[in-house]
């Protein structure tokens, strides 16, 4: 838990002049006033984007994603050193797969193992940035057309396309990250254009080789990771 506070603080420190995140009023890891590390942040008006998306017409949805991409591009404007991304994803998939191996048939297991042989090729073209890393509608606050982003405790340095894996998955399972109240209102047909809007307004994504294959790899990575948890 303390590590996540530090991760979130690092993100705030890297985005001090960003008006699309809550203000960080105080961060204290000294444990002088309390036995815990704590932070005090701005309370935002509005509600998560899940409460509004299903009510929007398609023009409003497109404009919302356009505005969101401008915010995310600002997050991604800092360009850190990269690392062997393919190796990281391969190792994590293999490790998680081994832990939940019994959940797969031998045929399914073999398909996943064989697909990993392509990771070096598909995950070679990388543009690294400090990403939010948990970007879904429950972490996007909407208030009178204004968007703000919350919850930075999973942020990390990674390729920019990895940022959008959850929004990509909304095309098929839009309810996945919604709360119990909003879950029933999330329908795939309301998300059918979300990926196209993302690519339209974050132009650099279109320059990444094997983008669609990469998103499928991230889906495998995410699914096996969640299977291991639950």
Give residue spans per PLM region.
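Glycine-rich, phosphate-binding/catalytic loops in enzymes
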Residues: 57-58, 92-93, 165-167
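Activation of the activation-loop gatekeeper triad in protein kinase-fold domains
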Residues: 151-155
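ATP-binding pocket architecture of kinase catalytic cores
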Residues: 1-84
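Active-site activation/catalytic loop segments of kinase-like enzymes and analogous catalytic loops
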Residues: 162-205, 219-230
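Conserved protein kinase catalytic core
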Residues: 32, 48, 140, 157-159
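Basic, amphipathic juxtamembrane/active-site segments
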Residues: 145-150, 168
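An alpha-helical support segment within catalytic cores of ATP-dependent transferases
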Residues: 29-32, 39, 60-61, 66, ...
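Short, surface-exposed acidic
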Residues: 204-215
């Amino acid at each position: 838990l303390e590590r996540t506070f530090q991760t979130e603080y690092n993100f705030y420190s890297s985005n001090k002049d960003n008006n699309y995140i809550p203000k960080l009023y105080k961060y204290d890891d000294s444990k002088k006033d309390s036995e815990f590390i704590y932070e005090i942040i701005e309370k935002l008006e509005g509600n998560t984007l899940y409460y509004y998306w299903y009510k929007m017409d398609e023009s409003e949805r497109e404009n919302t994603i356009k505005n969101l991409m401008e915010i995310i591009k600002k997050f991604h404007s800092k360009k850190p050193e990269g690392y062997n991304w393919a190796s990281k994803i391969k190792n994590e998939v293999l490790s998680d797969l081994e832990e939940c191996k019994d959940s797969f048939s031998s045929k399914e297991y073999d398909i996943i193992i064989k697909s990993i042989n392509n990771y070096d090729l598909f995950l070679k073209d990388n543009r690294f940035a400090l990403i939010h890393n948990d970007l879904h509608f429950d972490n996007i606050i909407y208030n009178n057309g204004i968007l703000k982003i919350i919850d930075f405790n999973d942020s990390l340095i990674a390729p920019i396309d990895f940022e959008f894996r959850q929004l990509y998955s909304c095309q098929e399972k839009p309810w996945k990250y919604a709360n119990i109240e909003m879950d029933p209102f999330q329908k795939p047909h309301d998300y059918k254009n979300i990926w196209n809007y993302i690519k339209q307004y974050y132009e650099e994504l279109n320059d990444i080789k094997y983008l669609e294959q990469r998103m499928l790899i991230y889906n495998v990575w995410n699914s096996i990771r969640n299977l291991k948890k639950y």
